Amino acid sequence: MNNVKELSIKEMQQVTGGDQMSDGVNYGKGSSLSKGGAKCGLGIVGGLATIPSGPLGWLAGAAGVINSCMK
């Protein structure tokens, strides 16, 4: 389990589709981000540890974890 890679901010933006905070997406409501943010973050961290190594494995796995978290 030593294959865990720390993703840079740029890599995470590529996986999630860009820097949404600076694109004017409305986070001002606070409800969706504050209620699910911590739970979602822990799910992503836990999910990333189980993704197979290799660039395609990381992209597919990280996208899947993030996508399932956003539902």
From Swiss-Prot:
<keyword id="KW-0044">Antibiotic</keyword>
<dbReference type="GO" id="GO:0005576">
    <property type="term" value="C:extracellular region"/>
</dbReference>
<keyword id="KW-0078">Bacteriocin</keyword>
<dbReference type="InterPro" id="IPR010133">
    <property type="entry name" value="Bacteriocin_signal_seq"/>
</dbReference>
<keyword id="KW-0614">Plasmid</keyword>
<feature type="propeptide">
    <location>
        <begin position="1"/>
        <end position="18"/>
    </location>
</feature>
<keyword id="KW-0964">Secreted</keyword>
<comment type="function">
    <text>Has antibacterial activity.</text>
</comment>
<feature type="disulfide bond">
    <location>
        <begin position="40"/>
        <end position="69"/>
    </location>
</feature>
<keyword id="KW-0929">Antimicrobial</keyword>
<dbReference type="GO" id="GO:0031640">
    <property type="term" value="P:killing of cells of another organism"/>
</dbReference>
<protein>
    <recommendedName>
        <fullName>Bacteriocin carnobacteriocin-A</fullName>
    </recommendedName>
</protein>
<keyword id="KW-1015">Disulfide bond</keyword>
<dbReference type="GO" id="GO:0042742">
    <property type="term" value="P:defense response to bacterium"/>
</dbReference>
